[in-house]
């Protein structure tokens, strides 16, 4: 069987979502590890006054492509930016571009999607379902297409506790939903959304389930593979450890925890944190397309790209390693010292929200006003709470994903491909990964230099001293207000102090005894 780089040699690849997190990494990996690929067509829309070519060039100029620039300086010649709007009829392709794509494309990687959990249902359906259907219809016209590779999500069927590598029946017929949305106004769509999505937590997951069914039904005559990643995080190894460029998913929570803004979150310590590194998702996508292209399986291939079944990691462990990392390598200008409480208790959660989030933010905004600056912390806390509401479903529940197809795929790789396109998450050391992840948010998202660590540590020590001073003042105030005015309270206080003194005296005496 040919190797993965050999399979991609001379191939023309069509990629959607190339300006997104996953798409960028896939583009870089494809060009670096399969250097003889003929060309990569990237569908990109105009945005903020930038042409598709300018947007692609901005992506290629980023740090993510540093390694590729060193190894293959001429890689840009293989990338062809094509103006396309996935939400428009026929993808808004010009006739000339459409003809080129139909004549040349061998492999499609469909990574584009709206990943916002609070997306309006109409918009989510438009990009995640209708755009996917239009791409399938375009693929059916391609004369040399070998594989249609669709990136979904492992949570598409999160209403099930055990999820196999199959496409399940959709919650509603996608065609009927699309037809209904055409005559509904936005108010009606918003009203019926909770009833439509049912036991799924958001429109993103709901529409990704519909998209899978569209791929299965509309692409029945195509050679289709689906990869379902769980919670996609920073890179594990490639192009370098810890690369991340956005606040999405856990990244924003990690940063908020490192800044000392996030102090509590509704989560179960024992719930599985099914994080999967972005380079594992990319490697699996490239390998899955290779397998389907070489073997031409009779049925659609689905791969649950998850870690919980083979290398379990829990949210309590995530919290421990995140806080430990940020205490050793603090973020600059932290609001408070990093410390997070995980709780699944409703009352306790809201207590900590009031005491550890809202009260400090309110007091800090008063301080900003008094010093002539614009208050901002309450707005930050409000945005943080909205993000937490969307994520608590995933931090409070666990799922079991079948990974038989993933194991089969891994066994099909030759020794060299197993190294180059590593998908074996059993080798993943979580403590090291989380440390690199946190450092990645510091370096690549916040653009903080590691040379600033001494100053950041000094600032963290200052916050510690402020905390000790505040607690001391609080104890004195409690003494003056309550204890000093009550004889019973004073007697209890003296008894406790006396008991502590006797214990310390006994401990001292015991420690100086020689045997």
UniProtKB/Swiss-Prot annotation:
Interacts with PEX19; PEX19 mediates the targeting of FAR1 to peroxisomes. PANTHER family: FATTY ACYL-COA REDUCTASE 1, MALE STERILITY PROTEIN 2-RELATED. It is found in: Peroxisome membrane. Keywords: Lipid biosynthesis, Lipid metabolism, Membrane, NADP, Oxidoreductase, Peroxisome, Transmembrane, Transmembrane helix. It catalyses: a long-chain fatty acyl-CoA + 2 NADPH + 2 H(+) = a long-chain primary fatty alcohol + 2 NADP(+) + CoA; hexadecanoyl-CoA + 2 NADPH + 2 H(+) = hexadecan-1-ol + 2 NADP(+) + CoA; octadecanoyl-CoA + 2 NADPH + 2 H(+) = octadecan-1-ol + 2 NADP(+) + CoA; (9Z)-octadecenoyl-CoA + 2 NADPH + 2 H(+) = (9Z)-octadecen-1-ol + 2 NADP(+) + CoA. Residues 1-465 are cytoplasmic. It is a single-pass membrane protein. GO terms for molecular function: alcohol-forming long-chain fatty acyl-CoA reductase activity; alcohol-forming very long-chain fatty acyl-CoA reductase activity. Its EC number is 1.2.1.84. One of its GO terms (cellular component) is peroxisomal membrane. InterPro entries: FAR, FAR_C, Far_NAD-bd, NAD(P)-bd_dom_sf. Pfam families: NAD_binding_4, Sterile. This is Fatty acyl-CoA reductase 1. Residues 451-507 are annotated as: Necessary and sufficient for PEX19-mediated localization into peroxisome membrane. It comes from Pongo abelii. The keyword Ligase does not apply. Its main location: membrane. Residues 484-515 are peroxisomal. Belongs to the fatty acyl-CoA reductase family. The chain crosses the membrane at residues 466-483. Catalyzes the reduction of saturated and unsaturated C16 or C18 fatty acyl-CoA to fatty alcohols. It plays an essential role in the production of ether lipids/plasmalogens which synthesis requires fatty alcohols. In parallel, it is also required for wax monoesters production since fatty alcohols also constitute a substrate for their synthesis. One of its GO terms (biological process) is long-chain fatty-acyl-CoA metabolic process.
